[in-house]
From Swiss-Prot:
Residues 52-72 are annotated as: Disordered. This is Protein SlyX. InterPro entries: SlyX. It comes from the Bacteria. It comes from Shigella boydii serotype 4 (strain Sb227). Residues 55-65 have a biased composition (Polar residues). The gene is slyX. Coiled coil: none annotated. Belongs to the SlyX family.
Length: 72
């Protein structure tokens, strides 16, 4: 009787392990897909930031363009 319960417990553990391995593999695929998507989004964000900076002139004048303060 003891052997049967040990065999049943072992079978249950093996079944759980198989499901866990399957779940881990699915999660790995999902995480990998998310990492790839995030890399694409980072690239798009970088490009959009560069375009935005290029299209907007800076409101801050360079030191050569600045007029000296009135007390000079």
């Amino acid at each position: 009787m003891q052997d049967l319960s040990l065999e049943a417990r072992l079978a249950e553990l093996e079944s759980r392990l198989a499901f866990q391995e399957s779940t881990i593999e699915e999660l790995n695929v999902t995480v990998t897909a998310h990492e790839m998507e995030m890399a694409k989004l980072r690239d798009h964000l970088r490009l959009l930031t560069e375009k935005l900076k290029a299209s907007q002139p800076s409101n801050i004048a360079s030191q050569a363009e600045e007029t000296p303060p009135p007390h000079y």
